[in-house]
Amino acid sequence: MKRCSIIVHSVSGNSYIIGSYLQELMEERNVDARLYRVDDPDLHIWANTQETTNDYYEDICALPLVSTSVLLKSDMIILGCPTRFGNITAEMKTFLDTTLPLTKDKSLESKFFACYTSCLNSNAEGAHTLSAMIYWAQSMGMLHIPFGVHDELDYCIQPVSGIVHLAGKEGSTRPSDRLGKEMEAYADTLSAYIQE
């Protein structure tokens, strides 16, 4: 069975919710999907000041921390994190910086890649974050699998490059059923690639 590692940084819980659902969808499609988190030494502070963080704090902290060895064992890597000023979070960037030695030995070359983000209120802002994650994957020689265009969905405003969730003020808008349908379509595409 092919392995898919879903690596999240979640503050308000939305990236965790999306990653958990994506894990479930990939498992339903016969993929060994595993969920990991990047280190966030300040998450407890957010949990004490922001109710949305507190809702999923224990669940997020229970996830195993990701390491570069996890990436090496993966056939597909999916990154998910909040958008900060059109970019990835500092915590996700800190983890990605640890992967620099992997560019030299090209050990991630030809692995599949996908990504998603949760942002305040702009698909355009989220699309910039997706581009930053895709740029990292391309630097590693990975093969990006885009969300693409899905005419079978009644309504879809996703960028073709990945999934963007609009979380609203303080990340209080949780992923909707419509986003769930979009993620199901993405999981169909991703699982088809990884199992070929």
Predicted segment positions?
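Short, glycine-/small-residue-rich phosphate/pyrophosphate-handling segment
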Residues: 109-155
